[in-house]
Amino acid sequence: MLDIRQIRENPQIVQELLKRRGEYDLQPIIELDEKQRQLETERSQLQARSNQVGKQVGEKIKSGSDPKGTEIKALKEEGNKVKAKLSELEPEEKELKAKIEALLLPLPNLPSESTPIGKSEAENIEVKRWGDEYIPQNPKIIPHYEIGEKLGIMDFERGVKIAQSRFVALMGAGAALERAIIQFMLKRHIQVGYVEVMAPLLVNSQSLTATGQLPKFAEESFKCAADDLWLIPTSEVSTMNLYRDEILSAEQLPIYHCAFTPCFRREAGAYGKDTRGLIRLHQFNKVEMVKIVHPETSEEEHQKLVADAEAILQALKLPYRILELCSGDLGFSAAKCYDLEVWLPSSGTYREISSCSNVKDFQARRANIRFKERNKKGTQYVHALNGSGLAVGRTMAAILENYQQVDGSVKVPEVLQPYMGREFL
């Protein structure tokens, strides 16, 4: 959530930064904030008068005035009127705060000053390409979903029968490969300092609001309406909310977590896109990296986060590129973001496999996650970062295509062979 104080003090700057992302009008928020501050001033004045009246009553009684006399009676009547007015202001203030929050919640994060300005993905900037030497030269590579079905390791037809379109059943070596990928990713992240988390797959509305999925992406999520519970679209949600409404010590930072979970998305805006294969499913597995850090280190931590995602792709020897996203293509909560895209030879394109975002204090404000430094007054909001490390289904798709052999078999990447106990599928 954006800082109302920043909007109040620098409305033109905030409006200009928001314009880099789209059309957003701050004027209704500014007007409501002005009303709220006027009410706060009035409440402070009334509270001061109430305290003054109470003090005067006490002093007069102490000096010998008749507690039932007209002077004391008049003061008490005034005090009661002031208290009544204060009581009237309370719901009005509460309503104004709720209205301001309702207008703030749909606003995206402000893009970082270093984020390239642009309107769409066409203006993203490629900053790195790796692994061209690993691009397969086999001219007969077929899509991952075709080789998966030929090998008997993917069953889309039964996935549809069990659920609906955009579901798959992995069989035999397919299930084993998925599990091997997950184990390898988690082990690697843990080795470099991430602490594994297994948190709920069902979360409440407050949790989704804290990380920015609600209210904007309600239509993209699966909801259990009777219980006010939602299936998570990413484990970033449950991992970040471990610390919701907490004050950490500066010594606890940085916090690194990794988590494997199934993720669930309705893909409401993806009609007709990637209708076959593992690229866009309603249920998919993902290993997520989450960092909670000191604001002064978040930019450095962002680069490390990208490197941790890269390390998985490099270990698997999967060709990829990195894009720096422009302001118009940023995710809702991101201030700065790099997308890692893996090479899929059957289509001759790079496809997103990880999105590494620095959300700065945007989620921390919504989730009320702060930290306190020793010998310093007050608290600060933490900075948060998240990134896929990696999307498991897309990793499998990339392996099935990049490691496809001329004879129709698929070689298991060397780093996964100890988990699989085999060299080929």
Swiss-Prot record:
- Where located? Cytoplasm
Does the entry annotate any disulfide bonds, and if so which pairs? none
> Residues annotated as region Disordered?
41-70
One short Pfam name that applies is tRNA-synt_2b
Binding positions for ATP per the UniProt entry: R265, R266, E267, E352, I353, S354, S355
Q: Name the catalysed reactions.
A: tRNA(Ser) + L-serine + ATP = L-seryl-tRNA(Ser) + AMP + diphosphate + H(+); tRNA(Sec) + L-serine + ATP = L-seryl-tRNA(Sec) + AMP + diphosphate + H(+)
Q: Which InterPro entries match?
A: aa-tRNA-synt_IIb, aa-tRNA-synth_II, aa-tRNA-synth_II/BPL/LPL, Ser-tRNA-ligase_type_1, Ser-tRNA-synth_1_N, SerRS_1_N_sf, SerRS_core, tRNA-bd_arm
A single cellular component GO annotation = cytoplasm
Q: Basic and acidic residues: which segments have biased composition? A: 57-70
Q: Which keywords appear in this protein's UniProt record, sorted alphabetically?
A: Aminoacyl-tRNA synthetase, ATP-binding, Cytoplasm, Ligase, Nucleotide-binding, Protein biosynthesis
EC annotation from Swiss-Prot or TrEMBL: 6.1.1.11
Q: Which domain of life is it from?
A: Bacteria
Residue stretches of biased makeup (Polar residues): 44-54
Q: Name one GO molecular function term.
A: serine-tRNA ligase activity
Write out the GO biological process terms: selenocysteine biosynthetic process; seryl-tRNA aminoacylation
Q: Which pathway does UniProt place it in? A: Aminoacyl-tRNA biosynthesis; selenocysteinyl-tRNA(Sec) biosynthesis; L-seryl-tRNA(Sec) from L-serine and tRNA(Sec): step 1/1
Classify the main location.
cytoplasm
User: Where along this sequence does the record place binding of L-serine?
Assistant: T234, S235, E236, E288, S388
Q: Quaternary arrangement and interactors, per the entry?
A: Homodimer. The tRNA molecule binds across the dimer.
Any domain commentary? Answer: Consists of two distinct domains, a catalytic core and a N-terminal extension that is involved in tRNA binding.
Regarding protein family, the annotation reads:
Belongs to the class-II aminoacyl-tRNA synthetase family. Type-1 seryl-tRNA synthetase subfamily.
Protein function? Catalyzes the attachment of serine to tRNA(Ser). Is also able to aminoacylate tRNA(Sec) with serine, to form the misacylated tRNA L-seryl-tRNA(Sec), which will be further converted into selenocysteinyl-tRNA(Sec).
PANTHER family referenced in this protein's UniProt entry, alphabetically: SERINE--TRNA LIGASE (PTHR43697:SF1), SERYL-TRNA SYNTHETASE (PTHR43697)
Name the UniProt record assigns to this protein: Serine--tRNA ligase
> What is the originating organism of this protein?
Trichodesmium erythraeum (strain IMS101)
